[in-house]
C-alpha cells in the first residue's frame, strides 16, 4: 500500500505545472454546533497542510485534459463532510458543463461523524452529480486507495466507468470486525482487500502507484466521448 498526500498524487499524475485547483474557497463550518468541532478542524488543517479532506481542480495527463479530485487521508482520515461532498459535486458539474472526463482518487474512512445527517446527505449529492456526468456520455475513472470505506464506497467511489485500486488497499463499507460480529462468521484473510474485490468483480483492475500515470493517460485517450473537450 502506498501512502501519499492528495497533492502528491495529483502532481504525479499530471503534466508539469498543469494542475489548477478550483473551489478551494469552500470551507467547513460547524452547522450542527458540535462542541470542539471548530478546534478539531483547525488542528487538522495544521497537521495536513490542507483546508479540507479533498482537493479538486483541472489538469492534463500526458496531454489529456481532465478534471480531478483527490482525498487527503491525513485530514480527519479523508472523511466526507459537507465541504468534501460539495467540492466533489461541483467538480463533476464543472466537468459536465465543459465536456471533460473526471479522474477521482479516493482515500477515505467514510462519512464524517461530526456532521451527522449532513454528511450522509453527501452520498446522494455526489452520486447524483456522477449520474448527470455519465448521462452526458463523459468518462469517470475512479482510483481506490487505502482505505476506501463507508460512505465513499457507498456513493461516488464505486460509480466509475473504470474502477481501479492499489494493491492490498482496504475497500468496503463496514469494517472487518463489524462484519464478522454481525454475520457471526470468520472472514477470509483477504476480505475487503483490493485483490478480494477484483476476484469478486467489484473493481476492474489493480494498478500499483508507479504505473498509474501511464494507465490513466491510456484510459483517458481510449475512452474519449463524442464532443469531449480536449483543448
What are these regions (language model features)?
Residues 1-50, 58-61, 219-231:
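Intrinsically disordered, low-complexity segments enriched in small/flexible residues
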Residues 6-9, 40, 84-87, 91, ...:
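General structural feature for long, well-ordered alpha-helical segments within catalytic domains
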Residues 41-43, 70-79:
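Short, basic, glycine/proline-bearing loop/turn elements
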Residues 48-53, 78-93:
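Glycine-rich anion/phosphate-binding loops
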Residues 59-72, 87-111:
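A structural preference for short, pocket-lining loop segments at secondary-structure junctions
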Residues 65-67, 80-87, 105, 119-125:
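Glycine-rich phosphate- or other oxyanion-binding loops that anchor nucleotides, phosphorylated ligands
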Residues 76-80, 112-115:
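A generic structural signal for short coil/turn motifs at secondary-structure boundaries
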Amino acid at each position: 500500500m502506498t501512502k501519499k498526500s492528495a497533492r502528491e498524487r495529483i502532481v504525479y499524475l499530471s503534466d508539469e505545472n498543469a494542475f489548477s485547483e478550483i473551489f478551494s474557497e469552500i470551507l467547513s463550518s460547524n452547522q450542527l454546533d458540535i462542541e470542539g468541532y471548530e478546534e478539531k478542524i483547525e488542528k487538522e488543517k495544521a497537521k495536513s497542510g490542507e483546508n479540507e479532506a479533498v482537493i479538486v481542480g483541472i489538469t492534463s495527463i500526458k496531454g489529456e485534459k481532465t478534471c480531478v479530485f483527490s482525498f487527503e487521508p491525513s485530514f480527519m482520515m479523508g472523511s466526507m463532510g459537507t465541504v468534501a461532498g460539495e467540492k466533489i459535486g461541483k467538480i463533476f458539474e464543472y466537468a459536465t458543463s465543459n465536456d471533460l472526463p473526471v479522474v477521482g482518487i479516493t482515500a477515505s474512512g467514510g462519512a464524517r461523524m461530526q456532521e451527522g445527517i449532513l454528511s450522509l446527505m453527501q452520498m446522494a449529492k455526489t452520486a447524483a452529480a456522477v449520474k448527470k456526468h455519465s448521462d452526458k456520455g463523459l468518462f469517470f475513472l475512479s482510483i481506490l486507495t487505502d482505505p476506501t470505506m463507508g460512505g465513499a464506497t457507498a456513493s461516488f467511489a464505486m460509480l466509475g466507468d473504470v474502477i481501479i485500486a492499489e494493491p492490498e488497499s482496504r475497500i468496503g463499507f463496514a469494517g472487518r470486525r463489524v462484519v464478522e460480529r454481525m454475520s457471526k462468521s470468520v472472514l477470509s484473510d483477504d476480505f475487503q482487500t483490493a485483490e478480494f474485490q477484483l476476484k469478486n468483480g467489484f473493481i476492474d483492475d489493480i494498478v500499483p502507484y508507479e504505473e498509474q500515470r501511464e494507465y490513466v493517460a491510456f484510459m483517458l485517450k481510449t475512452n474519449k466521448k463524442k464532443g469531449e473537450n480536449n483543448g
